[in-house]
Design a protein with these regions (language model features):
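N-terminal signal peptide c-region/cleavage motif recognized by signal peptidases
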Residues: 20-23
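Beta-strand-dominated extracellular/periplasmic modules and repeats
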Residues: 28-192, 196-213
Length: 213
């Protein structure tokens, strides 16, 4: 190969690499996309009527979920930072004892009859969403796979790559020991971790989706 051709092909090669890293890597349009995570075994399979944004109360029941009540809000954006409305946000989590309302969760942690455990929300104006829940418990110590507190989320809207992820919380001592969390890069961990606001028990969590076409 002549020197000039070699330089040209090397330049094209590195450009190709750049394009690939923009498409499949973390960086797109200046914003990092929310990283993906596995679904886990406990996506709800028992039908339930109440899937609203307050997971601390079940419609028609008197009483409130046990644990620390927390508020989470945020916005959904595309990779260019445009807010996306009408995005479906389907989320589920363990109760404050670390137990899922799922027939396959056979840990000895108690069920909380007042905890809703599952919500399906839509992002509204400017892609905003919010929900009230309890701080999920770590899976019990006797569970074979101990997990740090997390919330599972499935996000979908026509025209965007659907996203399956998990939300984490800052300053959780188990984060460093969590098998799934540890596998992520520092930057990915940052994207997946809600940020504490100045209000007590309130967190901000923004979601970045990839346009499908
Ligand atoms: Fe989980």
């Amino acid at each position: 190969m002549k020197r000039r051709e070699f330089i040209k092909s090397a330049a094209l090669g590195s450009m190709g690499g750049l394009l690939i890293s923009q498409t499949f890597g973390a960086q797109a349009g200046g914003n990092m996309l929310t990283p993906r995570e596995v679904e886990g075994p406990f996506y709800p399979i028992t039908p339930q009527k109440d899937k609203d944004a307050d997971l601390t109360q079940i419609e028609g029941k008197v009483g409130r979920a046990k644990g620390t009540i927390i508020d989470i809000f945020g916005q959904v954006f595309d990779q260019d930072g445009n807010a996306i409305e009408d995005v479906t946000i389907d989320l589920w989590q363990a109760n404050s004892y670390g137990k899922y309302h799922h027939p396959h969760d056979n840990s000895e942690a108690p069920i909380d009859p007042h905890f809703q455990g599952w919500a399906i929300l839509q992002s509204g104006k400017q892609g905003r969403f919010k929900f009230k829940t309890v701080m999920p418990g770590a899976y019990p110590l006797n569970s074979p796979q101990q997990r740090t507190p997390h919330i599972h989320i499935k996000i979908s809207k026509y025209g965007y790559e659907s996203l399956l992820t998990q939300l984490y919380f800052p300053d959780q001592p188990l984060n460093d020991k969590d098998g799934l969390f540890k596998r992520k890069s520092v930057q990915e961990q940052k994207m997946m971790t809600a940020k504490k606001t100045s209000k007590s028990n309130e967190y901000r969590y923004d979601i970045f989706l990839q346009k499908a076409f």
